[in-house]
Amino acid sequence: MNRKKNSRQAAVIDIDSNLLKMRIAQLRKNAISDLDRLEKPVRLGHEVFTTDKISFESLRELSELLKGYGEVMKEYDVGPYRVVATTALREAKNRSFVVDQLKIQNDMTVEVLEENQEKALIYSKVLEYLGRAQGKRKESALIAYIGAGTIGFAVYDGAKMIFSQNIPMGSIKLHDMLSGVENDTDNFYAVVEEYLDTVMGHIAIPTETGQVTNLVLTGGGIQLIARVCNVDTSGESFEIGTDRLKELFRQICSAPQEKIGIRYNLAEESADLLYSSLAIAIRLMDFSTSDKVIFPKAELWDALIHHMLVPKSETMFREQIRASAISCAQNIATAYHCNRAHSECIRKFACKIFDKMKGFHGLDGRERLLLELAAILHECGYYVAVKQHLLNSFDLIKDMDIYGMTDEEMLIAAYVARYNDDDVPSYEEPGIDGLSDEKRLVVAKLVAIFRLANALDKSQKQKLKDISVRQENNRLMISAKSDADLLLEKWAFAQCAPFFQEVFGLHPELSIQSGLI
């Protein structure tokens, strides 16, 4: 045990698809260092990807391993710790039962991270690495995470993420899904490549920044690729030429599958993982012009440990999420031909109203971000059809991959965009009813603010360049200067005022002063 005085200890337990991992680290003299790392193989991924459930045999094994990890944490006098789970538990149909039993048997609260949460944490450490490696030279990069059950993509323009998407197809899941075909063909590799083409060929990487110049990969199979290539992995990253990876892939494809493990001294399961990871990596090379692949050491627990031991880093992470989420939403809005000037106008107005009402809405920065996303994306439904464009917008937004945002958060943003006209939320709707009372209140509050902001640019001509907002007694006073004809905006504002007052108990009033006075 290497714990020292005047240090803080924290731990992360990661329930992965094929490993149960724990990392214990300490903060001493402003530096984070590892005290211990443990990992045990599990087969949760194989089980879930083939049966959709985690068996009680696997649950009992997992519980016993967690008890052992708990004892190790006591030995190190660990303070804060987090237990997180990713794809396997996320996709298990009986995940609620599993999480409940682990809470009862181990007194551990398991956080099942959604795809975008998991990827954003990993990408944040990749971005830290790129910041150090590139220095002042800011270059674009396609950052991809090859997990056991998912592949995550993000495009970095040198300052922020501008695109993010997840595919439910990782290295283990890819092999397990197609394993039934393996005995029916002598060219299993061709089947895998064709399947990857059908899945990944529809990814539309933004081209605003030109060709993506760097390809950055991370994930569970990366160390395996490095081992087979005899690459030194002692530093914080390593690089392998694309030609070398393609040649390795050709060698694997030309050998009978049973000989791959013998040739590279790998267990059968590792050989399957090597092939699947390489197949995905080769396909990802099509999205970049780089002649090499960068493999930084960036794992989920790196970010979680950092946030626990250095709390201010979590504030920086949240700001990174906000900037990248807005950037991704703006790129999607452009693809759907949304009116950028209008959406930016009401986004500014909505944020001003939100910020001046902190004592009345009780919402935080995350909900403010949802308001911004709704403003940016609320017109995307017009791309499908003018008829029922609000419902079209709702259907599109709720299923969007926006950097760092959860499914529930995107559902809330979709509802805010859905009710931006003359309609108001109804708790009788199945979707609204599926939200908790707390989240339904969030929807109502954001809708009330959003509709008021949208009314101020009803003509979509930005007649009001700016507004000032103040609360006075039981009134919300919104004032502006303009010489334009604002009859439409005043009418829309009056239509939205009753619902706003119903939600907040404040009567909104609009005061326009002529700019000529």
Model-derived features: positions:
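Short beta-strand scaffold segments in enzyme catalytic cores
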Residues: 20-25, 151-155
